[in-house]
């Protein structure tokens, strides 16, 4: 029963049955491991459930499915987020999650940077959605509007492609909020890699402090010192060392607050990592490129408008330009540029010849000088900072600066500098300084630097000196280099001593007289070589301002030189010339030698004329010299007596600063007197002021100091008769002296400058006393000029008589004579005391054919015409005419000869009549 029940229930009733039952169950459901089975003890027996492995597998499957689902959703969201980034799909599809998050954060910060900054960068493309209720036909836009929209959609990329660099924006922590994809062109780095990263990860450790300062931050203590203290070699490999750890900039006590005194503009140089650099190319750091950062700090929009609070800095927006590689063979040579090589102190050691194409400087002018010598004073500080950047980083680009010109003005220039090392000698370093011209010369001939001041007067005097040497090379053996050096020395000394001319004037008087006496004894008329050495301005003391005594003041860059034609070949010698002393009291000492030989007296006369020229003409060459005051009460018209032997053709030269072609083939020599003078057969220099003695017969003659750039007018001096010298005739001059009057009534007198002042000297034939100050009037322009010509003195171009002699007359002046009046323009004012001119005398007509007239019978007709054309007023030596007699002359000043060649031919002169002292004016021809 029990067996049957047991069998019917299927449960074993004994041990044997239980064992067989278990074996049968195991065969049907094999268990991999006994431990995986659980035995559950119950009151009715023991049984085994399904394996734990199956349950675990199901759980794992569900977990994997859930994780896969979550990852899919996450990836989908990241993918959707990446598509929102302003990046190409080819880039966003390959971004990892961290990059997507980093770029997203940077983009969000960038939008805040744009919208919250001052001024806000509102996107033009953003706006309310189009009004869909409006019909499509009404919403249709014009083709131009569509074109503008398409263009603006790609405007950013066009701008980036046009830039010779890349753009990036940093926040106040120094992280890249944005950087353009063009950074890969210049640094080889990826835009995705840099965006959201710290700028200090890519900046040279030596530039961390500067970068932090530009952002208004400071580095942790010791971090900047560590970077700055490294050597160049250590800094080159710092990216792989512990120093290259990204410094965490800490904000300052007032972190991003900018005072009103600070500027927002930024311009500096840093070195950034680059994968495009060649090994060994960069001098200061390998693996880095020098980047020029120019930008502006961006401020946050102030929240309170009622009060002024310091604005908070949000970051920095910059344009970065990678400097050209330091190898000079990779620099493109443009048309408006020139290259110089300088040493580490910016001392120029080489310059291209192309510099002369753009400015008035030559390589000779700048080689050996420092660049700072040619930089405008306001730009020196900027160049100094660029110099420091160059020494620290190896490359730099200067700001726009002004390069000073030689004769005034400047040119705007920008330079790119690179340190180059000699491959053969590593210790030999120099700088390749490439200059790019940005403008044409500005403010020409306007001195803006003290270095430009000496060149302006030298430019005017160089032309006259050059013409002097050219004339001497034709007429004489020439002027030595010592003479030229003495001229330049005198110019410098004169400019230095021009402020106090009186002491130097006294010195020059004694020194000149001593030299004159020495030359009288030591030189003979037969030694032209020895006289050549004296035919210059010998001492700088003679060049000091003395317009109050021996000239017309500062007379501009021109001078008149009077030459005499003679008839004898033996007279072709140059008389000794010296500078003119201003003290005529000492000149009168030589008047006691009236009975000396004619050659000796003529030498003295020429020396004094040279002094006259040296005293006044040299002052004209220096425009900086001011005209000293003049004691008008001591103005005296000088006169000189000469023998009839000296009657010859005067050659008056007007030197002009501007170069003029005066070749013999030039049309200007076709004028009759010039045509005669152009024959260099018998040149004779009358550049010395005449003495108080007789005119000697010319023994030694030579070429004048005058040059080719002069207007030559032949004036026979025998027709220039002297002014009367009675008791009321005129004032004493340095040329009057006490010499006896020669018997020849037609010996030409000398009327010196009306501004000459001499306390000593006797009267003329009329015996004027020392106190004689009676003034006579000129009858016109010609009379004044003739008397000055007769005195062989330098005379200015008379424009108008507008006032008394002013001590401050510094206007640029030109000079001319009656022969050059039709060529030289009137530009100066001759100020006479009380609008008076030197003494004049009534016309006393003479026979031009008489022996006393002093003319060679073979004189050309045109010479005689010009000779008589200037006669107009001079009377015999012995005749003394009062001032009242001038009123008897005809207003037209037409004259004829008494019995001569032109007895029936009237010749008008330049005068417009006689004017009273109150209304006398100079008329411009």
Curated annotation (Swiss-Prot):
CDD domains: bHLH-PAS_NPAS3_PASD6 (cd19732), PAS (cd00130). Residues 152-222, 324-394 form the PAS domain. One of its GO terms (molecular function) is DNA binding. Keywords: DNA-binding, Nucleus, Repeat, Transcription, Transcription regulation. Residues 700-710, 760-771 have a biased composition (Gly residues). One of its GO terms (biological process) is startle response. Residues 484-493, 529-549 have a biased composition (Basic and acidic residues). This is Neuronal PAS domain-containing protein 3. It comes from Mus musculus (Mouse). The lineage of its organism: Eukaryota, Metazoa, Chordata, Craniata, Vertebrata. The gene is Npas3.
């Amino acid at each position: 029963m029990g067996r049957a029940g047991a069998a019917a229930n299927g449960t074993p009733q004994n041990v044997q049955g239980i064992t067989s039952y278990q074996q049968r169950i195991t065969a049907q459901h094999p268990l991999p491991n006994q431990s995986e089975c659980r035995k559950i003890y119950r009151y009715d027996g023991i049984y085994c459930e399904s394996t734990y492995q199956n349950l675990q597998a199901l759980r794992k499957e569900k977990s994997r499915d859930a994780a896969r689902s979550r990852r899919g959703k996450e990836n989908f969201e990241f993918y959707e987020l990446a598509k929102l980034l302003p990046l190409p799909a080819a880039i966003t599809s390959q971004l990892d999650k961290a990059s997507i998050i980093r770029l997203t954060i940077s983009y969000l910060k960038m939008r805040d940077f744009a919208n919250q900054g001052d001024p806000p960068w509102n996107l033009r493309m953003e706006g309310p959605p189009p009004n869909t209720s409006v019909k499509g036909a009404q919403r249709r836009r014009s083709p131009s509007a569509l074109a503008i929209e398409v263009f603006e959609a790609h405007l950013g990329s066009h701008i980036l492609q046009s830039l010779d660099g890349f753009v990036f924006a940093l926040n106040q922590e120094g992280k890249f909020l944005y950087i353009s994809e063009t950074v890969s062109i210049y640094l080889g780095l990826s835009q995705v890699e840099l965006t959201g990263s710290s700028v200090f990860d890519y900046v040279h450790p030596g530039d961390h402090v500067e970068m932090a300062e530009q952002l208004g931050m400071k580095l942790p203590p010791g971090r900047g010192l560590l970077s700055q203290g490294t050597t160049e070699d250590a800094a080159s490999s710092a990216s792989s060392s512990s120093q290259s750890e990204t410094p965490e900039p800490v904000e300052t006590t007032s972190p991003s607050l900018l005072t009103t005194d600070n500027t927002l503009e930024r311009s500096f140089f840093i070195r950034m990592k680059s994968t495009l650099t060649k090994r060994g190319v960069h001098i200061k750091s390998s693996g880095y490129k020098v980047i020029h950062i120019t930008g502006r700090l961006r401020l946050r929009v102030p929240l309170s408008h009622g009060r002024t609070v310091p604005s908070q800095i949000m970051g920095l927006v910059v344009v970065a330009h990678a400097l050209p590689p330091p190898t000079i063979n990779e620099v493109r040579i443009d048309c408006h540029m020139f290259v110089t090589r300088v040493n580490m102190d910016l001392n120029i050691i080489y310059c291209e010849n192309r510099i002369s194409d753009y400015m008035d400087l030559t390589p000779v002018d700048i080689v050996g000088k420092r660049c700072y010598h040619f930089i405008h004073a306001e730009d020196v500080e900027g160049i100094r900072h660029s110099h420091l950047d160059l020494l620290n980083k190896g490359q730099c680009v200067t700001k726009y600066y002004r390069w000073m010109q030689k004769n005034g003005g400047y040119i705007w220039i920008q330079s790119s500098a690179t340190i180059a090392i000699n491959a053969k000698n590593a210790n030999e370093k120099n700088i390749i300084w490439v200059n790019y011209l940005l403008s044409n010369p500005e403010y020409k001939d306007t001195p803006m630097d003290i270095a430009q001041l000496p060149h302006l007067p030298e430019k005017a005097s160089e032309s006259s000196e050059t013409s002097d040497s050219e004339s001497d090379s034709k007429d004489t053996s020439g002027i030595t280099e010592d003479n030229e050096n003495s001229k330049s020395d005198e110019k410098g000394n004169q400019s230095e001593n021009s402020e106090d001319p009186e002491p130097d004037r006294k010195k020059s008087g004694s020194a000149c007289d001593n030299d004159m006496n020495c030359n009288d004894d030591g030189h003979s008329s037969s030694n032209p070589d020895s006289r050549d050495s004296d035919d210059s301005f010998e001492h700088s003391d003679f060049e000091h301002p003395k317009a109050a005594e021996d000239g017309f003041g500062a007379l501009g860059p021109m001078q008149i030189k009077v030459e005499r034609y003679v008839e004898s070949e033996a007279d072709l010698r140059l008389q000794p010339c010296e500078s003119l002393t201003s003290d005529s009291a000492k000149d009168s000492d030589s008047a006691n030698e009236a009975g000396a030989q004619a050659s000796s007296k003529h030498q003295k006369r020429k020396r004094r004329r040279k002094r006259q020229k040296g005293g006044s003409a040299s002052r004209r060459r220096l425009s900086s010299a001011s005209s000293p005051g003049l004691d008008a009460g001591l103005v005296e018209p000088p006169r000189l007596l000469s023998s009839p032997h000296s009657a010859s053709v005067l050659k008056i030269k007007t030197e002009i600063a501007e170069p003029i072609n005066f070749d013999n083939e030039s049309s200007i020599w076709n004028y009759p007197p010039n045509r005669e003078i152009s024959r260099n057969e018998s040149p004779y220099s009358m550049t010395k002021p005449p003495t108080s003695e007789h005119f000697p017969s010319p023994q030694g003659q030579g070429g004048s100091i005058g040059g080719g750039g002069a207007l030559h007018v032949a004036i026979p001096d025998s027709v220039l008769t002297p002014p009367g010298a009675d008791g009321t005739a005129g004032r004493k001059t340095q040329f009057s002296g006490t010499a006896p009057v020669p018997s020849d009534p037609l010996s030409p007198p000398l009327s010196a400058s009306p501004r000459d002042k001499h306390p000593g000297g006797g009267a003329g034939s009329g015996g004027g006393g020392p106190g004689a100050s009676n003034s006579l009037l000129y009858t016109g322009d010609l009379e004044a000029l003739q008397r000055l010509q007769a005195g062989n003195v330098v005379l200015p171009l008379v424009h108008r008589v507008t006032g008394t002699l002013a001590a401050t007359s510094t206007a640029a002046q030109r000079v001319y004579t009656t022969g050059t009046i039709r060529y030289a323009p009137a530009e100066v004012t001759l100020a006479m005391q009380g609008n008076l001119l030197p003494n004049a005398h009534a016309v006393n007509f003479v026979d031009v054919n008489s022996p006393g007239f002093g003319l060679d019978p073979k004189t050309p007709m045109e010479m005689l015409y010009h000779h008589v054309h200037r006669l107009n007023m001079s009377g015999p030596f012995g005749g003394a005419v009062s001032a009242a007699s001038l009123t008897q002359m005809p207003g037209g000043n037409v004259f004829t000869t008494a019995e001569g060649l032109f007895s029936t031919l009237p010749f008008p002169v330049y005068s417009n009549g006689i004017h009273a002292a109150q209304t006398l004016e100079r008329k411009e021809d």
